[in-house]
Amino acid sequence: MKKPAIKKLHRLLLFYLLLWIILFEFILPANNFLPKPSVVLLSFDALWRDYKFPVNFLATISSVYIALIAAYFIAQYLSPIIFRKNHFLSEFLFSLHWFSIYIPWIIFGIFLIYWFPISPIIEFIFLLITAFFSLIIKIKEEASNVQKEFIESAVSLGAGENIISRKIIWKSIQPKILKHTILLHFNLWTLAIVFEFIKNGYGLGGIFRMALDYKDLSALFAVSVITGLFVFLGNSAIKFYRNKFCHWSLN
Amino acid sequence: MKTGNLLEIKDVSKFFHGSAGAKYQVLEKINLSIEKPTTGGIFASIISPLDSGKSTLMKIISAIEKPSAGEVLIEGNIYNKPDGTVVYIPEKPSSFPWMNVKQNIEFAIEVSKNPNKKNNTKIDEIISAVGLTGYEDHFPHEKSFGFRFRISLARALAAGAKIILIDDPFKSLHRETKNEIIQLIKNLSTIYNQAILFSTSNINEAVLISDKIFLLSHRPGRIFKEIEIDCTKRDEQSEYIASVKNEIEKLFQNHDKIPSFA
């Protein structure tokens, strides 16, 4: 996003914040639509103590980011196989993609909850598999669009298959993979929260479930704001990495 | 069988399979040879109408593609595995945008299996030879087509190429840059005693810079004439050049029944 667009977005967010404070703190009576800003501020304390926010937050954030980073590096490591046509592993992994087109991926998470005892490891595995498949499908798709002149010139210089995979094809698609990672990052947060919500255990999804059970609107609102803030920070970190280390443009 | 030729193409044919299973021929029994340059390098070109299989032929010579029949010999030895001896420079810029100038050249040295490849101590010399001194840390995507072409040339030199194949290099260049690049290629082939083979659809360009011209017919491509250019009479305005150009056009008209293609 260009800088003026970001400024515009920030101004818009500030406008909504002020609107919320003015309307819901001073003008409108207490209601079930949005909480009073002062009550939300007070609920942070309750979040910390009653909802065990630090532990739950740490559980979700660690699952999301460790899964995302691990999946990225595993996919990068396996990319030479993924690039190969007619390799059994590549074909097998890609065939599983078929299921994800027609069956919403969260259903796989529900099966995991059914099969295994509640444990942070299961959530991590669920997110890792999700991220890994999403990445390899994108890698395979982008690999077929690599500018053939890069490959041909590298081949004529004497480069072997492995070097071409790692230093040409991977590098060529890396900016697009990182762009995809931004979307994937958002999807992982969503899946993690839904998984935890269904599982009714620890994690931010667990807090949402508990807050719903207690009909605690201010806690729901506060956790939503914090989640949004961290998704925004995560997005910004990925974009920073992409701009810093994948500065070239292939378009 | 060892010969005195640097490059020899013997009866090379190429077929492609279409999507409906149809087989179509792109090249038919191509035979051509380029002798070893003694001093000063050699500059040859392949002229043909558009879409006549020039690029396919170049890829076969550089062993990127395999011929359906026939063989390519470099100094009498079959060349079917690319090792940096014959370097192909495609029509579109092919310098890697994720590597800076120096890294692009280092890559060529790293991957080349050619015994004549340069070592890392020669990088500065190569950068200077292609006119990129001071730009070592610059990235190609920030620069012009001419700049990126110089990087491709530098990589070919670093790999120790004996033959550099340049696919329709001047199509995207404006006149001034084109003249600069032509002069640069000529100087480099003289200094490094290399053979340069380039493909073009532009008769004028080929006649003005080549020592030897091969005429490739329309599909299926066949070399139907070889023309030696007398370099002593070469001058853009000269009658000799005009007569060679006319001769080539007539040959194509008679052979391919195409009124004009350039």
Q: Model-flagged regions — what are they?
A:
Chain B
Residues 117-135, 187:
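Conserved ABC ATPase "signature" region
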Residues 153:
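Hydrophobic anchor residue at the start of the ABC signature
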Residues 164-168:
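Catalytic Walker B motif of ABC-type/P-loop ATPase nucleotide-binding domains
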Residues 62:
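Helix-to-loop junction immediately C-terminal to a conserved catalytic motif
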Residues 92, 99-111:
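Q-loop/switch helix immediately C-terminal to the Walker
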Residues 139-143, 147:
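Conserved ABC ATPase signature
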Residues 70-82:
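Conserved ABC transporter NBD signature motif
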